[in-house]
Amino acid sequence: MALVTDKTITPKRLELKKVYSTYEFASLKKRLLLSNLRFRKTFPSRQINSLYFDNSEYSAIDDSISGSSERKKTRLRWYGDLEQAIDPVLELKLKKGSLSWKELYSTSLKLKPSADNWLNAFTATENDSHHLNIKDILPPDHTIPISLVSYYRNYFESFDGRIRATIDMNLSYRDQTLQRQPNFKIQRMDSSKVILELKLAKENLNLLRDLTYNLRFTPQRFSKYCESTFQHRVKWR
């Protein structure tokens, strides 16, 4: 039974982020819709859940904090109910210089939230009795479940389709190193900020001039995975 299928590699692009206060959400949305790029809502808002994997050295965090020119993050992503992961997507998020892209792998997995640990928390979608070790589908350098991050995403796109924008809010972080069992209950909420991200091909960067002025948008580094693991940073400082 093929548990991982349909590999997709996304185009390389710029991903520019800025953190705003939650009370600015309505204003941000209005400015996007009224901008010269005439953004429009293109997809229903939804909750995104990402289970991040790393290693005992926390190398993905170290690369991000140090600003390494080449980075990789490994995560399983699904949408909607936190404990209802069916056919999650395995994502390798890659970055080289200023450009980011993903390797996406469809899976035929279903989460068993009552499992005694993450490594055997998934079964085959078509056969509940077919348990597997999640390490079997993960890259060998990122096999330890570290953090479960959830947030609510709003989707927008410019009128010509050349720029995508997302606004993320209601972030929550669940440390998966606290216990052997999957941790869905103990969480740290962050409802004080929203994250605006602009996604575009490098050749379209010139289109942002007026938009970034109106949005008071100065790109800054922000990683949800890094934010989720701040309590562990003493381990590599």
Regions found by a protein language model. Name each.
Residues 1-237:
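Phosphate-end processing signature that detects enzymes handling 5′-triphosphorylated RNA
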